[in-house]
């Protein structure tokens, strides 16, 4: 199963976040989820904001196009990305992660 799915016009991305990491970035796959490390602590929505900003930058979409659909207070989240196709998200992930992303896609 892939961490990428489509819901209407938007793409949904299943992620697992690790707050309070030494650096922020996409770290690879965590089972069927994309693992994202964040410097921010999970306080006052800071980690969710950083997660959306990081993913928007990685996918080349505006920050307003990425939002938390499920799991706002959990490490496992579903992010909604508007204005991009599942194929474009998959291509961006393969560019960041290489073979590991292809195995999960």
Curated annotation (Swiss-Prot):
Record Gene3D superfamilies: YggU-like
Annotated Gene Ontology cellular components are: cytoplasm
Q: Classify the source by domain of life.
A: Bacteria
Membrane-crossing ranges are: none
Supply the InterPro entries for this chain: DUF167 (IPR003746), YggU-like_sf (IPR036591)
Question: SMART domains attached here?
Answer: DUF167
Q: Which NCBIfam families match?
A: DUF167 family protein
Q: Return the similarity comment.
A: Belongs to the UPF0235 family.
Name of this chain's protein: UPF0235 protein CT1832
């Amino acid at each position: 199963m892939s961490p990428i799915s489509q819901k209407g016009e938007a793409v949904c991305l299943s992620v697992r976040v690790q707050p309070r990491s030494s650096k922020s970035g996409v770290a690879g796959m965590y089972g069927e989820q994309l693992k994202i490390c964040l410097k921010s602590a999970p306080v006052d929505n800071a980690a969710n904001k950083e997660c959306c900003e990081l993913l928007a930058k990685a996918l080349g979409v505006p920050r307003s196009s990425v939002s938390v659909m499920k799991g706002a207070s959990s490490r496992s989240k579903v992010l909604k990305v508007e204005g991009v196709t599942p194929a474009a998200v998959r291509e961006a992930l393969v560019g960041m992660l290489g073979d590991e992303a292809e195995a999960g896609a």
